[in-house]
Every structure is written in structure tokens, then in C-alpha cells.
């Protein structure tokens, strides 16, 4: 949206979201959502992001003095836009290489048809399987034992449709798929029967699988085609996802992802430059590109060499590490909740409290504040709280005055402090305020409930015994 455009409310009917469908990124989709093809290895030129570089201004910016060249938004308004890198040769996706191997075991290397035919005794049962993931695994279990394309079953010596060609044995080692082809005694050229399958070769085979065979394997032709499991066009995340940190006046520390994208660009440009040279030089540059693309996605794969910074040797934090686990984006940021104005202590029982009451220690009540707007009805009470100040309960800690100016009552003379209608007083917690009380693990909605505050001496939360059941609480220190 360009600056100055007047926002108008949509006239579309409200719809209920029933489900979210995930799929694989189509190279055409990556091209469509990209605003720039990234090919310049240099990130900055005299402090300004280079055109076609990893921090090209068309992808957005985190610099306060600059604006996004695509939407004209500043660092607060622009969420960023994706770019892309055209790879000189396709590479394996580290998360899908096992899946690629499974699919290759299910199709013929020559005609690219399924190794299992409708004459097979398990064909009908496999066709009835609905779960896509389960379906691929079941088809793989049957096809991995089929050695010749077109045989009706393992014991049959008669061929149905198919090429009749013997199939290679496949195994994954690191970021490679190794193929061992059967030796033909009449053909001496088959003696050297072991070789690595390139991602380009696998891409051609997967791309030639028919729509019907893809569906039989459990793939969706709109959301996830088999050939999309191999990377031929790499999306580049926008700079707001990987902001740089200024260490001094002229020193800029780039994010790990930016560093990795730069390494990918260097390896990709070197590979493109040497495509017409000797095979061993091409292979060396290709393996480097494969390594950097893999460690951009996952740098913690077992048995895989770790990508590190050249200075300091610190391991790169890859995309997977940012998403997974308790500290990741999903559990740590999206699902995890962090709040201000909260307190934590041990609970003890108090049968004298009402069911909806919560005994709160005075020390906590003096620390947690509630903002209350000054009105004609409460101005006298607010003045008393301000006079009591932050160290006498019930009192107040801050005043938010005209223009949002904050006054800390720890340093002000409370008796001389002026308040007026519309001011906001950050007052202490007092009796009959409503608060939310939570005990982990929060397994159901009754793990967080509302209570009326009753300020009490000592240092523990007090709770009526009859309220402990929904919290699954006891009084042994939990």
C-alpha cells in the first residue's frame, strides 16, 4: 500500500476459518512473490544496501533513515518482502532428501512409471488408503522389493506394462543419494555401476511422474508436487526477519541468515562461472552450494558438518533452530505468553477466604500497579493514594500526566504533586480488585481463573481449599 492511500473498510462477508492447508512452495510461486532476484554478493556500498544484494531496499529495511522501495513504508510500517536466488544447479532440500529417496524407489528410472501395477495383489488395497503420508509409506514398503519395472509381483516372470528394466539400489549418505545399478554381463560399461545421483537428475525423474501416479503416492498436484521437494529457486527472507545489529559507529554485525545467504551467493556465482570447466571443479563448487543451502535450513543434522562463522567459529543458527523447541518462534513467541504486572510465589490454604477470593501478600500488592483514570468521582481517593506514595499501602507509584509525561513518585514530593481529571494513576493493588490466577501446567481453561484480591500479611498466596481442584494444586510447595 502506497503512503497517503485512504483505508476503506472491506465490503466482503465475514467467513469462518475452518482449516489451514500447508503445502510446498512452487518455484513459480517463489518467483511471483519475489520482488528482486538476488545475485550481488556485496551487501552494502558506502553504507547503502546494494541493488540486487541480500539487503536490497526492495525487500524492506530496518534502517530508520531509509524506506522500502516496494511499498514506501519505513521500518515500522513495512513487514518486508521476499526475494529469490536462481540456483545455477538444483540442490537437495535437507528436510526432504529421505522423502526423495523413497519416491525414487517407487518409480522406474527409465520410464518414470510406478513400479507397482494394477496387476499386483496389493494394488487395490493401496488405492483405498486415504492418509497421504501413510499411503506413501505403504507404497514404498511394496515397491522397495520390486527389482524390475513392469513385473506383476516378485514371483512373476511375466511383464505387464513397464520398461522391463532392472532398478538400482539406493541409499542416502549425508547430502547425497548413491545408486548401485545392476551389472549386465553382456555390457562391459555396466561394471562401473555405482555413482551419486545429482539433484538435477532426480528433479527430471520426479518431474516426469504422471499426475495419476503422484496421486497414488499421496501427493496433491496443486499443493505439493514431487519435483518441488528439490530446490531450484531459493527464497530469500526479507531483512526485517534477519535484522543487523550496529556494534559501533561503523561496525555492523549481520544476522546468521544474512551471512549464510551471502555464502550461498558466492558458491552459486562460482558454480555458474565454472559450469564449462572440468567435472571435478564443477563438483567441488556444487558440493559447497549444497552444503550452504542445507545448513541455511538445518545446521544441527546428525552426521552433517556444522556451518560456522569464519571469525570466532560460532555455529550458524539456521531456520529450523529458530522455529523448533521451547525457545523457538512457535512455542516461545506465538504460543508462549509473557506478561508484565505479574507475580509468582508459593500457595498456602486459608479456609476463611471466600471461594472467589485470593490472598495476596502486601509486598506484592505494593509492587503490582493498576492504572486508574482520575475522574470527578474518584479524585479525592486518588489524591490520598498519591500522598501515601509508593512505600505505604495503599498508595501509588506513578502518575501519567499531560502528553503522556510520567512522574515517578519515588522521587517526587507526594504532598505537593498536582493531579487533574484525565490523569492516570498507577496505584497499588487493593482489596476487591480482580486478577487472573494461574497454576502451571495450564492443561485446561480452569487453570486460569479470576479472583477478588484480599491483601494479607506474610509472603504466600492464600487460596480456599475448595478451589484447589481445577488448579490441581496442593500445599507442598507447588
Curated annotation (Swiss-Prot):
It catalyses: RNA(n) + a ribonucleoside 5'-triphosphate = RNA(n+1) + diphosphate. GO terms for molecular function: DNA binding; DNA-directed RNA polymerase activity; metal ion binding. Its EC number is 2.7.7.6. Phosphorylation activates POL II. Mg(2+) 2 binds at residues 474, 476. One of its GO terms (biological process) is DNA-templated transcription. Belongs to the RNA polymerase beta' chain family. Component of the RNA polymerase II (Pol II) complex consisting of 12 subunits. This is DNA-directed RNA polymerase II subunit RPB1.
Amino acid at each position: 500500500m502506497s503512503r497517503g492511500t485512504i483505508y476503506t473498510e472491506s465490503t466482503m462477508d465475514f467467513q469462518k476459518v475452518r482449516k489451514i492447508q500447508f503445502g510446498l512452495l512452487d518455484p513459480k510461486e517463489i518467483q511471483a512473490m519475489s520482488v528482486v532476484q538476488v545475485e550481488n554478493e556485496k551487501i552494502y556500498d558506502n553504507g547503502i544496501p546494494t541493488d540486487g544484494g541480500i539487503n536490497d531496499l526492495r525487500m524492506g529495511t530496518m534502517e530508520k533513515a531509509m524506506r522500502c522501495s516496494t511499498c514506501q513504508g519505513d521500518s515500522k510500517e513495512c513487514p518486508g518482502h521476499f526475494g529469490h536466488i536462481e540456483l545455477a544447479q538444483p540442490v537437495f532440500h535437507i528436510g526432504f532428501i529421505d522423502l526423495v529417496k523413497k519416491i525414487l524407489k517407487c518409480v522406474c528410472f527409465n520410464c518414470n512409471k510406478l513400479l507397482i501395477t494394477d496387476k499386483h495383489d496389493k494394488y487395490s488395497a493401496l488405492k483405498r488408503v486415504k492418509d497421504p503420508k501413510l499411503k506413501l509409506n505403504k507404497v514404498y514398503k511394496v515397491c522397495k522389493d520390486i527389482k524390475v519395472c513392469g513385473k506383476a509381483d516378485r514371483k512373476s516372470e511375466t511383464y505387464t506394462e513397464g520398461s522391463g528394466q532392472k532398478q538400482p539400489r539406493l541409499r542416502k549418505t549425508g547430502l547425497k543419494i548413491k545408486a548401485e545399478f545392476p551389472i549386465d554381463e553382456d555390457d562391459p560399461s555396466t561394471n562401473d555401476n555405482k555413482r551419486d545421483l545429482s539433484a538435477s537428475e532426480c528433479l527430471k525423474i520426479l518431474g516426469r511422474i504422471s499426475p495419476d501416479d503422484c496421486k497414488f503416492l499421496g501427493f496433491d498436484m496443486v499443493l505439493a508436487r514431487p519435483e518441488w521437494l528439490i530446490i531450484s529457486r531459493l527464497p530469500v527472507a526479507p531483512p526485517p526477519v534477519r535484522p543487523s545489529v550496529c556494534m559501533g559507529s561503523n561496525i555492523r554485525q549481520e544476522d546468521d541468515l544474512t551471512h549464510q545467504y551471502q555464502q550461498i551467493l558466492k558458491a552459486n556465482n562460482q558454480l555458474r562461472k565454472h559450469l564449462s570447466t572440468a567435472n571435478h571443479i564443477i563438483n567441488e563448487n556444487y558440493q559447497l552450494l549444497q552444503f550452504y543451502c542445507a545448513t541455511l535450513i538445518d545446521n544441527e543434522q546428525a552426521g552433517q558438518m556444522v556451518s560456522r562463522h569464519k571469525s570466532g567459529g560460532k555455529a550458524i543458527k539456521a531456520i529450523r533452530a529458530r522455529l523448533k523447541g521451547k525457545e523457538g518462534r512457535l512455542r516461545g513467541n506465538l504460543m508462549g505468553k509473557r506478561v508484565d504486572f505479574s507475580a509468582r510465589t508459593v500457595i498456602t490454604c486459608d479456609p476463611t477466604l471466600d471461594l472467589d477470593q485470593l490472598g495476596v501478600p502486601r509486598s506484592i500488592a505494593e509492587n503490582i500497579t493498576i492504572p486508574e483514570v482520575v475522574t470527578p468521582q474518584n479524585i479525592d481517593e486518588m489524591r490520598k493514594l498519591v500522598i501515601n506514595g509508593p512505600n505505604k499501602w495503599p498508595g501509588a507509584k506513578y502518575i501519567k500526566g499531560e502528553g503522556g509525561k510520567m512522574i515517578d513518585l519515588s522521587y517526587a514530593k507526594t504532598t505537593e504533586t498536582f493531579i487533574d481529571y484525565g490523569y492516570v494513576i498507577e496505584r497499588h493493588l487493593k482489596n476487591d480488585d480482580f486478577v487472573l490466577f494461574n497454576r502451571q501446567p495450564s492443561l485446561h481453561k480452569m487453570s486460569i481463573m479470576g479472583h477478588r484480591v484480599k491483601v494479607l500479611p506474610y509472603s504466600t498466596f492464600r487460596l480456599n481449599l475448595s478451589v484447589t481442584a481445577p488448579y490441581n494444586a496442593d500445599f507442598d510447595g507447588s
